[in-house]
């Protein structure tokens, strides 16, 4: 009887472990982070929540990472349980507050717990660049990429749009990187963390021709060598990208945009 009860307890414990979300905790804690409330990152593999994991790894701040490995629906169910109105990744529990929007979360963590790291000083000439790219990443770049993706998946393009398109927004980044090593200016910053996701989307989904943007490619190569990003991938993307969108069969032809009617 006792043996059977022990066996049942062991099986129950194994079942609980199998069903539980994967939890990872940062191995290092930066001195002075004691005032930070507990941070739990609710994550979907290969999505924007990776930015917050990367940020915490760069800063050496403690966090818990919650997702169901290889199960996007299961991970989303965990997010929906704590954020039912706008379930999205990242959803971050910061003490007793629920936070969304990766850019806002990055700014909050850097302002309160970054100790001056990953962000130019207020009087730095690099601060305007940093702020532009922090917001350009989602406000212009990602927005245009996904808009073009939906349109081009429905009807593959024959000519470039007369409006700002995916090639134009990536070219803006390419031109900036011709004169600056990082999107925050002289040093790696939160702006670089913001920009990696949409620039990977641009090439992975065949929205642009990667060969046209050597400065972006060189920047990506530097980024991929960062130890904090490697740790992030080990923890937050252990099996590689899952559930990704299909690549476009073709993108708009490169070159000048078509003229606007009447111009």
Regions found by a protein language model. Name each.
Residues 1-17:
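N-terminal secretory signal peptides and thylakoid transit peptides that target proteins
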Residues 3, 22-37:
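C-terminal segment of N-terminal export signals and the immediately downstream linker at the start
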Residues 7-8, 76, 127, 163, ...:
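Short, structured helix-loop boundary elements
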Residues 31-160, 262:
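GST-like domain detector, emphasizing the conserved glutathione-binding G-site
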Residues 69-72, 191, 237:
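Conserved beta-strand edge residues that scaffold enzyme active sites
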Residues 133-225:
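GST-like fold's C-terminal all-alpha helical module
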Residues 226, 231-232:
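A late-sequence structural motif
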Residues 236-263:
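Acidic/histidine-enriched, glycine/proline-rich intrinsically disordered or flexible terminal extensions
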């Amino acid at each position: 009887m006792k043996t059977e009860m022990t066996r049942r307890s062991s099986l129950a414990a194994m079942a609980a472990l199998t069903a539980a979300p994967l939890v990872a905790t940062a191995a290092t804690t930066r001195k002075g982070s004691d005032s930070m409330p507990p941070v739990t990152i609710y994550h979907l593999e290969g999505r924007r929540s990776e930015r917050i994991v990367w940020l915490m790894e760069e800063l050496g701040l403690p966090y818990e990472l919650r997702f169901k490995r290889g199960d996007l629906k299961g991970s989303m169910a965990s997010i929906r349980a704590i954020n039912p109105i706008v379930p999205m990744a990242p959803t971050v529990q910061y003490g007793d507050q629920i936070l969304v929007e990766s850019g806002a979360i990055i700014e909050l963590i850097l302002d309160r717990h970054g100790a001056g790291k990953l962000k130019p000083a207020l009087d730095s000439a690099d601060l305007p660049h940093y702020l532009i790219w922090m917001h350009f990443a989602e406000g212009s770049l990602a927005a245009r990429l996904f808009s073009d993706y939906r349109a081009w998946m429905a009807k593959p393009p024959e000519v470039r749009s007369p409006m700002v398109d995916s090639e134009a927004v990536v070219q803006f980044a390419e031109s900036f990187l011709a004169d600056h090593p990082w999107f925050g200016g002289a040093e790696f910053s939160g702006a670089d963390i913001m920009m990696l996701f949409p620039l990977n989307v641009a090439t992975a989904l065949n929205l642009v021709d990667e060969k046209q943007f050597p400065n972006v490619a060189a920047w990506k190569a530097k980024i991929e060598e960062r130890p904090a990003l490697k740790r992030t991938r080990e923890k937050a993307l252990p099996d590689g990208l899952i559930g990704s969108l299909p690549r476009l069969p073709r993108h708009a032809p490169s070159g000048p945009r078509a003229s606007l009617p009447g111009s």
